[in-house]
Design a protein with these regions (language model features):
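Rhodanese-like catalytic fold shared by cysteine-dependent sulfurtransferases
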Residues: 1-20, 26-58, 67-111
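Short, surface-exposed ligand- or partner-binding patches at beta-edge/loop junctions that are enriched
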Residues: 62
């Protein structure tokens, strides 16, 4: 694990199997393709719904490329959470050949 802006960060290969993943992308991005088992909480709703994020373990925060997840990681860290920003986001996840699922009935893809 590394740090970006003094916040914990990890590559997609460093995410432990079964670790909680928080996807902060918007609904249409989530619907097109996401990590199976991830929790969806758009960055635009994070302040109102932060209590839905587990407090008792590291949570790996992901977006499309890493910008929104870095902002979400900074926000959550202020309030006692243990967030880890996922470097490269869903783009890196897909590039690594890791599986994604779709909610649309079409082939999963990263928007």
């Amino acid at each position: 694990m590394d740090t970006v802006n003094n916040l914990p960060s990890a590559t997609v290969d460093e995410i432990p199997e079964g670790a909680p993943v928080l996807d902060v992308r918007e609904q249409n991005e989530w619907d097109a393709g996401h990590i199976e088992g991830a929790q969806h909480l758009p960055l635009s709703q994070l302040a109102e719904r932060a209590e839905e994020v587990p407090l008792d373990q590291d949570v790996y925060v992901i977006c499309r490329s890493g910008g929104r997840s870095l902002r979400a990681t900074a926000y959550l860290a202020q309030y006692g959470y243990d967030p880890v920003n996922v470097l490269g986001g869903m783009g890196a996840w897909a590039d690594a050949g890791k599986p994604i699922v779709s909610e649309t009935g079409e082939a999963a893809r990263v928007l």
